[in-house]
């Protein structure tokens, strides 16, 4: 597609074709008072060389993980991405936004999506998965709507240990649909089980949990699932896929629907996106899933083939009654996820998860030895942890920047009661020397 603006001759042809004499006549319905009178101040075009230098100067103003050592997490994670991921990802046959409606010319794309779905099912212990979602937050919101549809109930329980921005997206999706959201407090960095049990009744469609949660803590998912099921509700789990290299799968813990942010596999930080969400569920809920689903079948010659299946759920079939109203998906990001995870294999994933766990615990232990600093919550955590500090978190982060270290997230941004707390993330990308440098830098701050 050509993005060069129309020429004067082309404009005249368009106006003649639609029966309008001039541009002024075309825009006659727009009042003069709201029209821009002055010309836009747009500079002259740049040569390619000038443009590359200009964009390079702009990019140099950013602080990236190439130049700085970062301990930020909170939903976007720095992981090592092997070179084979981009080598395969950027092949021209994959590098397209085309939705594969015509299976006869889309077998490669369809098979790649099918493999993604298969990997998600293996990771989560679920029976079916879709082709991907926009991100982890929208996947969780769609899972909540699935739960309401499946149970015919209009209330969900949402712990405050779920990512605060995920909770914002939940409100955006659910409140206009008349779904009541009841937030459950936390205790020691995990869901307050007593408060949850009191809030549970036969009006609740689902209990939503995130494990590892926003604070990095492992929730008691199996116990929470049993409580939800006892009242006829569902258990929806948001998970970090890397953690599943060590932890029990959500399916083993009794989850009915599982979602998550897929960015940790194959997708760089990208200053916040694009990312991808995944959504998987038990077989009885598959027809309520949003998004595309690719299925395996056989052609008339008995050869294996792939097609978009269960399309009666989708908007191009059922319009406003559709279970799915997703206009696209994150297929290229999902392909990066698939390539990275396939390359790791079970053993590689387990090793990756083990490194994340060990390095985070080493970092937490060493920081906790510093005067005026301690681990805020006691309990099992994966690769994120909260540090309580007597020094201002902002002062700590500003001081660390002078060492080219990006420190933890100031939790007061989302939790006013945690104004002296920082959330740190340590992944396999950090060496012992990196962590020791962080600890030394924090130790200098008075």
From Swiss-Prot:
Assigned EC number: 1.4.4.2
Protein name per the record: Probable glycine dehydrogenase (decarboxylating) subunit 1
Any one GO molecular function term: glycine dehydrogenase (decarboxylating) activity
Task: Please give the biological process terms from Gene Ontology that the record holds.
Answer: glycine decarboxylation via glycine cleavage system; nucleoside metabolic process
Keywords for the protein's UniProt record, in alphabetical order? Oxidoreductase
Under InterPro entries, the record lists: GcvPA, GDC-P_N, GDC_P, PyrdxlP-dep_Trfase, PyrdxlP-dep_Trfase_major, PyrdxlP-dep_Trfase_small
Note the Pfam families from the entry: GDC-P
Subunit and partners: The glycine cleavage system is composed of four proteins: P, T, L and H. In this organism, the P 'protein' is a heterodimer of two subunits.
HAMAP family given for it? Answer: GcvPA
Signal peptide span: none
Entry similarity comment = Belongs to the GcvP family. N-terminal subunit subfamily.
- Catalytic activity of the protein: N(6)-[(R)-lipoyl]-L-lysyl-[glycine-cleavage complex H protein] + glycine + H(+) = N(6)-[(R)-S(8)-aminomethyldihydrolipoyl]-L-lysyl-[glycine-cleavage complex H protein] + CO2
What is this protein for, i.e. what is its function? Answer: The glycine cleavage system catalyzes the degradation of glycine. The P protein binds the alpha-amino group of glycine through its pyridoxal phosphate cofactor; CO(2) is released and the remaining methylamine moiety is then transferred to the lipoamide cofactor of the H protein.
């Amino acid at each position: 597609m050509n993005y060069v603006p129309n020429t004067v001759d082309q404009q005249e042809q368009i106006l003649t074709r639609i029966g309008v004499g001039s541009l002024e006549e075309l825009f006659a319905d727009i009042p003069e008072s709201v029209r821009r009178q002055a010309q836009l101040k747009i500079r002259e075009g740049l040569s390619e060389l000038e443009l590359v230098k200009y964009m390079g100067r702009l990019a140099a103003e950013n602080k990236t993980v190439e130049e700085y050592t970062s301990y930020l997490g909170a939903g976007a994670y720095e992981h090592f991405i092997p070179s084979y991921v981009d080598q395969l990802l950027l092949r021209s046959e994959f590098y397209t936004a085309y939705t594969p409606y015509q299976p006869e010319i889309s077998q490669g794309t369809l098979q790649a999506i099918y493999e993604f779905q298969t990997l998600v099912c293996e990771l989560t212990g679920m029976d079916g998965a879709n082709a991907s979602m926009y991100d982890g937050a929208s996947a969780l919101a769609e899972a909540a709507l699935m739960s309401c549809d499946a149970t015919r109930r209009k209330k969900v329980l949402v712990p405050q240990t779920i990512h605060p921005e995920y909770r914002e997206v939940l409100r955006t999706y659910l409140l206009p649909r008349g779904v009541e959201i009841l937030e459950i407090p936390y205790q020691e960095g995990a869901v307050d089980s007593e408060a949850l049990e009191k809030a549970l009744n036969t009006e609740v469609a689902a209990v939503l949990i995130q494990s590892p949660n926003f604070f990095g803590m492992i929730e008691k998912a199996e116990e929470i699932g049993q409580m939800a099921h006892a009242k006829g509700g569902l258990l929806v789990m948001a998970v970090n896929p890397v953690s599943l290299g060590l932890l029990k799968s959500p399916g083993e813990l009794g989850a009915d629907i599982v979602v998550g942010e897929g960015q940790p596999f194959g997708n760089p930080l990208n200053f916040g996106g694009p990312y991808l969400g995944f959504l998987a569920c038990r077989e009885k809920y598959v027809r309520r899933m949003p998004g595309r689903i690719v299925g395996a079948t056989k052609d008339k010659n008995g050869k294996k083939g792939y097609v978009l299946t269960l399309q009666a759920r989708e908007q191009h079939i059922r319009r406003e009654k559709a279970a799915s109203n997703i206009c696209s998906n994150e297929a290229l990001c999902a392909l990066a996820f698939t390539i990275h995870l396939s390359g790791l294999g079970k053993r590689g994933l387990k090793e990756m998860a083990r490194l994340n766990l060990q390095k985070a615990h080493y970092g937490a232990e060493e920081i906790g030895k510093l005067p005026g600093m301690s681990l805020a919550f006691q309990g099992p955590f994966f690769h994120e942890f909260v540090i309580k500090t007597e020094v201002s978190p902002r002062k700590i982060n500003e001081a660390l920047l002078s060492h080219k270290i990006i420190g933890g997230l100031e939790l007061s941004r989302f939790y006013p009661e945690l104004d002296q707390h920082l959330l740190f993330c340590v992944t396999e990308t950090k060496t012992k020397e990196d962590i020791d440098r962080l600890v030394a830098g924090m130790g200098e701050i008075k």
